[in-house]
Amino acid sequence: MAETCKMKYSVLDSPLGKMELSGCERGLHGIRLLSGKTPNTDPTEAPATPEVLGGPEGVPEPLVQCTAWLEAYFREPAATEGLPLPALHHPVFQQDSFTRQVLWKLLKVVKFGETVSYQQLAALAGNPKAARAVGGAMRSNPVPILIPCHRVVRSDGAIGHYSGGGQAVKEWLLAHEGIPTGQPASKGLGLTGTWLKSSFESTSSEPSGRN
């Protein structure tokens, strides 16, 4: 019988509003935007410094690591490349599924300053024809920003919707990382060769961008 997780919570005041982090001793379970601000999409304006508003005593190490990672991200996104990632223990990461495979590929392959299309991410996850399933995986992402579903865009460059806080939040995150919007996805252009390009061109079943 699986052991029930003893959940703990903490709150971070970020440039996007208050964010709730949830997790147990074994890993992070979720990142949730509690109250949205109207993000300033001007990338030349420095974001407000994030502030930890507190939580229960004895915050598990995965929440401590996630807080440190998010604080660094909101100060300077590139600085997160050298930081440890918290262990992840949401049920979606405990199941052998295409959703888990997509989320892991997105986390490990699509780095700061890059974007990827639904079709490209489907190919990276092993099924080039599963672009619509990738859209479903983005909606199921329990840890947005950490697993960067905001970097997943349509093939034509349209950014689409964003279940992690809405289109304005997605635009802010892309601008914060210095990623231009309205341009084709940048991932794969020399990463995996011509097989990716041919796979993308042979599939047309791309979701409407509601992730």
From Swiss-Prot:
Binding-site residues for DNA, renumbered to this chain: T99, Y118, Q119, N127, R132, S155
Transcription regulation listed as a keyword: no
Keywords, alphabetical: DNA damage, DNA repair, DNA-binding, Metal-binding, Methyltransferase, Nucleus, Phosphoprotein, Transferase, Zinc
BP GO annotations: DNA alkylation repair; DNA damage response; DNA repair; methylation; negative regulation of apoptotic process; positive regulation of double-strand break repair
Record-linked InterPro entries: MethylDNA_cys_MeTrfase_AS, MethylDNA_cys_MeTrfase_DNA-bd, MethylDNA_cys_MeTrfase_DNAb, MethylG_MeTrfase_N, MGMT_N_sf, WH-like_DNA-bd_sf
Recorded GO MF terms: DNA binding; metal ion binding; methylated-DNA-[protein]-cysteine S-methyltransferase activity; methyltransferase activity
Region (Disordered): 35-57
Cofactor binding notes: Binds 1 zinc ion.
Statement: the UniProt record of this protein carries the keyword Hydrolase: no
UniProt function note: Involved in the cellular defense against the biological effects of O6-methylguanine (O6-MeG) and O4-methylthymine (O4-MeT) in DNA. Repairs the methylated nucleobase in DNA by stoichiometrically transferring the methyl group to a cysteine residue in the enzyme. This is a suicide reaction: the enzyme is irreversibly inactivated.
Name listed for the protein in its UniProt record: Methylated-DNA--protein-cysteine methyltransferase
Classification lineage: Eukaryota, Metazoa, Chordata, Craniata, Vertebrata
